[in-house]
Amino acid sequence: GVGRNFFNQIAKPETVRKILLKAYARKEAVTDELIDLLMLPARDAGAVEVFLAFTGYSQGPLPEDLLERLPCPAIILWGDQDPWEPIALGQAFANFPSVKQFIPLAGVGHCPQDEAPELVNPILQNWILEFAAPVGAHSGS
């Protein structure tokens, strides 16, 4: 059907590259390796169905619904050059009690983890070390 044809049109390396070049502030992060990694799931059986379910999913839950109930501390990293989600949205999410830190990332777009792993990874490593339970804390002894 129409959905399968649409999937087949966008599940091409050149199309994925064009989309990423719009989303990423750091254009040099859009590498052939990244495109190949992102294309792998498109080759799986059932990929069309998953894609159609994802693109047709317009009902909740919204981040604000989840942040309200989140039972653990949260951190938000947000690229200040994100063309699709304005930084003001991330700043609004930072007002939820579960959000302990909001960190804007200068010069980064929609996918900070891919665009700027040298910024994101140390922040997340420190966050995990700060909030992770000590080994054995949940052993029941």
Regions found by a protein language model. Give the residues of each.
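Generic structural signal for small/hydrophobic residues in well-ordered secondary structure
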Residues: 19, 38, 51, 76-79, ...
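Conserved loop-alpha-helix segment in the C-terminal half of the alpha/beta-hydrolase fold
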Residues: 69-108
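Catalytic active-site module of serine/aspartate enzymes centered on a nucleophile-bearing elbow/loop
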Residues: 98-141
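Glycosyltransferase donor-binding loop in the core domain
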Residues: 8, 43, 82, 109-112
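Conserved alpha/beta-hydrolase catalytic His-Asp/Glu region
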Residues: 5-69
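Active-site helix-initiating loop/hinge in glycosyltransferases
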Residues: 62, 86-89, 115-116
